[in-house]
Amino acid sequence: MFRITLAIWLSSIAATACAADITVFAAASLKESLDENVKTFAAKSGRQVRVSYAASNALARQIENGAPADLFLSADEAWMDYVAQRNLLAQGTRRNLVVNTLVLVAPADSTLSLRIAPNFPLAAALKGGRLALANPDTVPIGKYAKAALTSLGVWSEVEKTLTRSENVRASLVLVARGETPLGIVYATDAKAEHKVKVLDSFAASLHPPVVYPGAVVAGRLNPATQALIDYLGGPEARAIWIKYGFGIAR
C-alpha cells in the first residue's frame, strides 16, 4: 500500500513539474538575449522554459493553428496584432519589451565601403550578387527594410536581388559565410556574429519603429506565465536586453 501511495505521489510531482514548464514562441533575432533571460528566470523561479525561435509570421500562424505556445514574443507589432485580432492573447498581458535598429552588413573580410544615403549605389555594390534579406512580404525585418529602401529610393533596383530568407538569422548566415556580399539584419544580430561587419545603420525615421511586443497566449495565463512576462519587462531582464544591444521600449 505504501509503495502504491508513494508511486502516486511521485507521479503527481512529475505531472506538476511537467505542467509547470513554459513554452515561448519568439522571434529569431531574440535568441542570445532571450536564452540568457530564460536561464536567469528559470534559476530564480524553478520553472523550466522552452523557447522555439522562428520568424514572427511563422510563429503567429502556428499559434493560430493551435500550437501549444504559452508566450509569444514578436519582432513587430503587426504580427502580434494578427494574433490579438483572432482573440488568441490573454487580456492585459501584452506589452512592448524592446526596440532594435536595422544595419547593412558585409562579410567580416569584405573590403567594401558603403554609406546609406538617398539613392545610394546598393545595387551596384552587389556586383551581380544577392542581397541577404528575409521575405519582405511577411517577415518583420524584410518589411522594415523594404520601407527603408523605398524611402531611400533604391528599392526597385534591388528587389529582384533578394534572397527572401525565411528569417533574419538565415540572412545573417548567408553573409557570414560569404555567400552574399551584403545583407540587412538587426543591429543585435550583427553584434552576435563575428563573421560579419556593419557598414552603416539605417536611420529610424526611414521605417516604422522596430518594436518587440510580448504577451501570454489565450488560455495559458497562470502564475508561471504571468511571472515570466512580468520578468521580461522588469529591471533584471532589461539589463540583459541592453547587454545584447537592444533598446528598451517606452
Regions found by a protein language model. Give the residues of each.
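Bacterial N-terminal signal peptides that target proteins for export
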Residues: M1-W9
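N-terminal signal peptide c-region/cleavage motif recognized by signal peptidases
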Residues: I13-A19
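Alpha-helical transmembrane segments and their juxtamembrane interfaces
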Residues: L10-I13, M80
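Intrinsically disordered, low-complexity segments
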Residues: W9-L10, A203
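Exported/periplasmic ABC-transporter solute-binding proteins
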Residues: A19-A67, S74-E77, D81-N100, V105-R250
